[in-house]
């Protein structure tokens, strides 16, 4: 399925698309270069919207039921590239991180690699799930990647009833 990313208001980060929508829901298909229009990505987006419409219709007509639990990823913080005293980037995303969004990393695993082959590692004990790894659009915001924590929501009957009520089903 599609990963669910919860990015609650982070006062340190502004200017993101989710801030422009009153419901706070954004479906992002990417990565996409800025000011680049790609018909394949637009087509993928339409497929997802149609799928979500069918899913809600099937739920409304009792042809499917909600799962017992839902995994989602909650934004924790974002980190910048390692920089020198002149604020120049001194290390790049480690090759093991490239194209590995949504995959958990443990303490000691590589994040960055500098020109001298020095590896900068993840230092926390708790598993973290990085997203937006090396996204060009976020470099100007000094974001090399964002860290999320994976959580599981148990979908008991009370939650399911509330969700269906929210959707007016």
Feature map (PLM): residue ranges:
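Structured catalytic-domain cores with a bias toward divalent-metal coordination
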Residues: 1-169
């Amino acid at each position: 399925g599609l990963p669910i990313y919860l990015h609650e208001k982070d006062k340190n980060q502004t200017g993101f698309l989710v801030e422009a929508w009153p419901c706070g829901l954004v479906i992002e298909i990417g990565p996409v270069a800025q000011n680049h229009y790609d018909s394949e990505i637009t087509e993928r987006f339409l497929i997802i919207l149609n799928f979500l419409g069918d899913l809600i219709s099937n739920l409304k007509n009792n042809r499917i039921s909600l799962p017992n639990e839902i995994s989602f990823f909650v934004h924790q913080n974002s980190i910048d590239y390692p920089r020198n005293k002149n604020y120049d980037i001194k290390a790049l995303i480690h090759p093991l991180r490239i194209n590995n969004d949504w995959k958990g990393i443990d303490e000691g695993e590589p994040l960055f690699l500098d020109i001298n082959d020095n590896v900068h590692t993840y230092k926390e004990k708790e598993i973290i799930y990085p997203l937006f790894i090396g996204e060009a659009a976020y470099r100007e915001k000094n974001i090399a990647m964002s860290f999320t924590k994976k959580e599981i929501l148990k979908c008991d009957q009370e939650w399911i009833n509330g969700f269906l009520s929210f959707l007016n089903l």
